[in-house]
């Protein structure tokens, strides 16, 4: 079905930048296939902004993205670029886009990637649309980010297995999940995994509180405890485990899940979200929009200025936090 194209878009570039997230390939696929359906050529930039200023660009067609929707990672590869932080680096990238006749750029990534796209547009006038791709779910302007659902499922699977062995040995496990600045993953995993306690960056409660929580769990007859800690909480899982051992003398184990949360086959929710947002990004350029992130709020597509995605804070659900406390008896 033809979509109006008042902006006269003929060629679009797409790149992935920063940390990878499950579902990025589904977003790339959606951009390419939506473009093809609307008579718009799509070029892919390899290795993000790092590859852009080096001219790592190639045409992409529907067959190039076939059999990719189920794959983790990103077929375009990703990298962090120090060169892009300089005006000279961005000028070189802009020249590459002009050389390829690009009318607009779709950036799939997090706030760092959006910074790069924002300054490219401000300095060189190339329309940029952001697509939220980060497992942390910390971008303002969308209910969820691409990769978040899969990261939660990956972490939860590990928590379930650690709970089995923890209960068998009557042992405490302190499990660290990703989330440098936000506790979305930690909070969801804590509720879904039945954790006794959760520590998130948004809540600066004293680390010593965990000692009383563990003692209370033992008094209630629990054979083991699961404590979830977001990596952004002061001191991380190691500090929490040390506090428990110092205050109780109990055997405590730390498990840092790390980068495993970024990998793996994306779950259906991430594939669907990525497909919708990739399509919406192309339509946004055709509508003449620029400097915005396409997100999903309440089931509909929302457009948020790129600078607001990092200037405004996306809070964790206080209702869910209350629920975690209520159920940890």
From Swiss-Prot:
Description of activity control: Allosterically activated by ADP and other diphosphonucleosides, and allosterically inhibited by phosphoenolpyruvate.
Q: Which cofactor does it need?
A: Mg(2+)
| Alphabetized SUPFAM superfamilies for the sequence | Phosphofructokinase
Main localization is cytoplasm
Protein localization: Cytoplasm
Q: Which domain of life is it from?
A: Bacteria
Q: Name one GO cellular component term.
A: 6-phosphofructokinase complex
Q: What is its EC number?
A: 2.7.1.11
Broad enzyme group: transferase
- Binding positions (ATP): 19, 80-81, 110-113
Question: Record-annotated residues binding substrate?
Answer: 134-136, 171, 178-180, 231, 253, 259-262
Q: Its annotated pathway?
A: Carbohydrate degradation; glycolysis; D-glyceraldehyde 3-phosphate and glycerone phosphate from D-glucose: step 3/4
* Keywords, comma-separated and alphabetical: Allosteric enzyme, ATP-binding, Cytoplasm, Glycolysis, Kinase, Magnesium, Metal-binding, Nucleotide-binding, Transferase
InterPro entries, from UniProt? ATP_PFK, ATP_PFK_prok-type, PFKA_ATP_prok, Phosphofructokinase_CS, Phosphofructokinase_dom, PKF_sf
What does the annotation say about its assembly with partners? Homotetramer.
Which family would the database say this protein is a member of? Answer: Belongs to the phosphofructokinase type A (PFKA) family. ATP-dependent PFK group I subfamily. Prokaryotic clade 'B1' sub-subfamily.
Q: Could you identify this protein by its name?
A: ATP-dependent 6-phosphofructokinase
Q: Name the source organism.
A: Deinococcus radiodurans (strain ATCC 13939 / DSM 20539 / JCM 16871 / CCUG 27074 / LMG 4051 / NBRC 15346 / NCIMB 9279 / VKM B-1422 / R1)
């Amino acid at each position: 079905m033809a979509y109006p194209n008042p902006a006269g878009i003929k060629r679009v570039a797409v790149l992935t930048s920063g940390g990878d997230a499950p579902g990025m390939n589904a977003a790339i696929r959606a951009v390419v296939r939506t473009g093809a359906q609307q008579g718009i050529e799509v070029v892919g930039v390899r290795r993000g902004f790092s590859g852009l200023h080096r001219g790592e660009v190639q045409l992409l067609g529907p067959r190039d993205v076939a059999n990719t929707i189920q794959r983790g990672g990103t077929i375009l590869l990703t990298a962090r670029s120090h060169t892009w932080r300089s005006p000279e680096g961005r000028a070189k990238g802009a020249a590459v886009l002009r050389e390829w006749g690009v009318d607009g750029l779709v950036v799939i990534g997090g706030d760092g990637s959006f910074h790069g796209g924002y300054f490219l547009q401000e300095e060189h006038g190339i329309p940029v649309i952001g697509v939220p791709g980060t497992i942390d779910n910390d971008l303002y302007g969308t209910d969820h980010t691409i990769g978040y659902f899969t990261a939660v499922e990956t972490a939860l699977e590990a928590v379930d297995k650690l709970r089995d062995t923890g209960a068998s040995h009557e042992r405490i496990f302190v499990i660290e999940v990703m989330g440098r600045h936000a506790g979305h993953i930690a909070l969801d995993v804590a509720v879904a995994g039945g954790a006794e306690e959760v520590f998130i960056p948004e809540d600066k409660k004293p680390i010593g509180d965990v000692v009383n929580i563990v003692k209370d769990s033992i008094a209630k007859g629990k054979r083991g405890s699961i404590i979830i800690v977001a990596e952004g909480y002061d001191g991380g899982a190691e500090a929490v485990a040390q506090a428990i051992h110092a205050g109780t003398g109990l055997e405590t184990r730390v498990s840092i899940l790390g980068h495993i949360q970024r990998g793996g086959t994306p779950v259906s929710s991430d594939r669907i979200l990525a497909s919708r947002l990739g399509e919406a990004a192309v339509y946004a350029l055709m509508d003449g929009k620029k400097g915005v992130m396409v997100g999903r709020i309440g089931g509909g597509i929302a457009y948020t200025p790129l600078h607001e995605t990092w200037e405004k804070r996306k809070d964790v659900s206080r209702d869910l936090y209350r629920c975690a406390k209520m159920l940890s008896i």
